[in-house]
Regions:
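Class I SAM-dependent methyltransferase SAM/SAH-binding core
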Residues: 62, 70-114
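Conserved glycine-rich SAM-binding loop
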Residues: 67
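A short, conserved alpha-helix within the catalytic core of class I
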Residues: 134-145
């Protein structure tokens, strides 16, 4: 592995601060949705939910770091009776999600810092490509927060830090003509992501046992846990 990928990077992604206006930010989010389609990003989350809930069940799901809401719309298509909440602390993300989601989908989008969400529980808490945005300390706290607020279980889908995806994603992004910030931030996000050993250490720091870790194509590490209240 290249030396620059031996340890997790602390370089910050540009998108949250470098977009000139909402229109550019929304374009980046639309391209990220395209990335998720091309790389089948949401498949592990959807498969996990199918294993734990009937398609017609009226369970609740909270998506942390929901972005444009494409994961929640995918969940809605498969689980028409689910009660869906999307949380993101960036106001432009919430605005873009509301604009991209038809009213008939009935998704509750909330602009908030997740740690400020007190007094609310959900059957399932999910996040997709969110964990690598956090520091190690924040991620430990996030794991503990999920354990406190998920009734039936939680699922983290994130990137796997690997040289092939690190060097390959910019080529894919250029070929697909995705926004420059998406192309550049993609490599940064991969460098900020985790390897199996690091996830084990973070779970231990959080005091969480019984979590399952699985690798998914292409270069995704997913962490799932069924909660004691289920």
């Amino acid at each position: 592995m290249p030396e620059r990928l031996q340890a997790r990077s602390t370089t910050q992604e540009q998108m949250d601060t470098a977009c000139a206006d909402f229109a550019e930010y929304a374009r980046c989010l639309r391209d990220l949705t395209r990335v998720n389609i091309v790389t089948r990003t949401h498949a592990p989350v959807l498969a996990w939910l199918r294993r734990h809930a009937p398609a017609d069940a009226a369970f609740s799901v909270c998506d942390i770091g929901c972005g444009e809401g494409d994961l929640l719309r995918a969940i809605r298509r498969r689980f028409p009776s689910a009660r869906l909440t999307g949380v993101d602390r960036h106001p432009w993300s919430i605005r873009a999600a509301r604009e991209a989601t038809p009213a008939s989908a009935q998704v509750d989008y909330v602009e908030a810092d997740l740690f400020a969400l007190t007094g609310r529980d959900w059957d399932f808490i999910v996040s997709s490509q969110f964990a690598h945005h956090l520091t190690d300390e924040e991620l430990v706290r996030f794991i503990q927060w999920q354990d406190a607020h998920a009734v039936r279980g939680w699922f983290i889908a994130d990137l796997h830090r690997h040289w092939l995806s690190y060097y390959g994603f910019p080529l894919l992004a250029r070929a697909m003509r995705w926004h420059r910030l998406v192309r550049e931030d993609g490599a940064v996000s991969i460098a900020r992501s985790f390897r199996t050993k690091e996830w084990r250490a973070l779970l231990a720091r959080a005091g969480v046992s019984g979590a399952q870790m699985r690798w998914h194509v292409p270069f995704r590490l997913c962490i799932a846990r069924q909660c004691a209240r289920s």
